[in-house]
Amino acid sequence: MSMFLDTAKISVQAGRGGDGMVAFRREKYVPNGGPWGGDGGKGGSVIFRVDEGLRTLMDFRYNRKFKAKSGEKGMTKGMHGRGAEDLIVFVPQGTTVRDAETGKVITDLVEHGQEVVIAKGGRGGRGNIRFATPRNPAPEIAENGEPGEERQLELELKILADVGLVGFPSVGKSTLLSVVSSAKPKIGAYHFTTIVPNLGMVRTKSGDSFAMADLPGLIEGASQGVGLGTQFLRHIERTRVILHVIDMSASEGRDPYEDYVSINNELETYNLRLMERPQIIVANKMDMPEAQENLKAFKKKLAAQYDEFDDLPMIFPISSLAHQGLENLLEATAELLAKTDEFLLYDEADLVDEEAYYGFAETEKDFEITRDDDATWVLSGEKLERLFVMTNMERDESIMKFARQLRGMGVDEALRERGAKDGDLVRIGKFEFEFVD
């Protein structure tokens, strides 16, 4: 049996490292001062942290982009730029993080307080003080900051509804769910309108959010497997609060109180613990004729079943179609959830083994060579492109250093083997230069 799945697609971008600085020491009594440019600060990483207080991924529907700050540039006197703070993103317990492009699982976040670096901040570029050598004591070389990692992610949260809607078919459960959430269940005036559970994420005006399930309609005999009863009951046993929806207009010709007793009998027959869940009675269709009189009769019959010292179940008169009484119902539901402990969450049958891919690093290719239609040689590859973006192309010494790095990686030799000749154009990104054999 599948669980409900809440999903969200987001983008994360770690901060860029600060650029290194080219600077020289110039003080009155220090002739021929050497390099004095400091390193750039590291970029902030994007870190996911588990918060057991979160129940849904609803917050990611409103905020889909997460970008950490960049590190500051290096300064004179060899001082490093300030590193950027990491961006902490809170996620619910049980969140699975996938790479949206490959579909691979990056990590499973299962423990409260667990942290995972989802996008690593870029390294700060080195200042010219780092490149001083006996042969070149005054280098005019500094690195640009390394770009931070950028990822498109898909978050999945296997969840079970906090709140379950129970009641006879056609009492208005699907309509209620569609009104208070973004769920779009199929709605019709016939029995077993809902044949599979529908899930909606509900947010109250006070900012609380919870998952509400509209479950397959229940009939007498469900606990013995009649109709869709077994499927219904296996879902409802995992909820923490039950909203018992009753058609107070009696439009189907049934007595509202008899409906209430019948449904509770099925819940008790299937599993005694179901009756331990706090239950709110939702008196629906109060905009219809006869509803007010039926509600009075219902309350009278209900009170007769309780001792004078017992607390009666809460009753909220509403009309889903007319949008009446919904705000008070949702606030009361959120308050009840806050003080209700969790019941059974998972069966062994619910747990799906799937291959997980942890970490980000795959085998990194140094470079690749292709040729455009205009005969330009095109260089690409993660390592090569990272070296390129960290090279300050406005300084000759930095360009010469980059050329030596390419030679050391074997790029020159590979171009010769592919047939490159002296004077051929070579392109990296938007930067073009001539190949010198």
Swiss-Prot record:
Instruction: Provide the protein's localization.
Output: Cytoplasm
Query: Does NADP show up as a keyword for this record?
Result: no
Chain positions recorded as GTP binding sites: 167-174, 192-196, 214-217, 284-287, 319-321
- What GO CC annotations are associated with the protein? cytoplasm
- InterPro entries, alphabetized: G_OBG, GTP-bd, GTP-bd_Obg/CgtA, GTP-bd_prot_GTP1/OBG_C_sf, GTP1-OBG_CS, GTP1_OBG_dom, GTP1_OBG_dom_sf, OBG_GTPase
Q: Which UniProt keywords apply?
A: Cytoplasm, GTP-binding, Hydrolase, Magnesium, Metal-binding, Nucleotide-binding
Q: Which CDD domains does the UniProt entry name for this protein?
A: Obg
EC primary class: hydrolase
Start and end residues of each OCT domain: 359-437
Residues the entry annotates as binding Mg(2+)? 174, 194
What Gene Ontology molecular-function terms does this entry list?
Answer: GTP binding; GTPase activity; magnesium ion binding
Q: Which family does it belong to?
A: Belongs to the TRAFAC class OBG-HflX-like GTPase superfamily. OBG GTPase family.
Assembly, per entry: Monomer.
Q: What does this protein do?
A: An essential GTPase which binds GTP, GDP and possibly (p)ppGpp with moderate affinity, with high nucleotide exchange rates and a fairly low GTP hydrolysis rate. Plays a role in control of the cell cycle, stress response, ribosome biogenesis and in those bacteria that undergo differentiation, in morphogenesis control.
State the name under which the record lists this protein.
GTPase Obg
Gene that codes for this?
Answer: obg
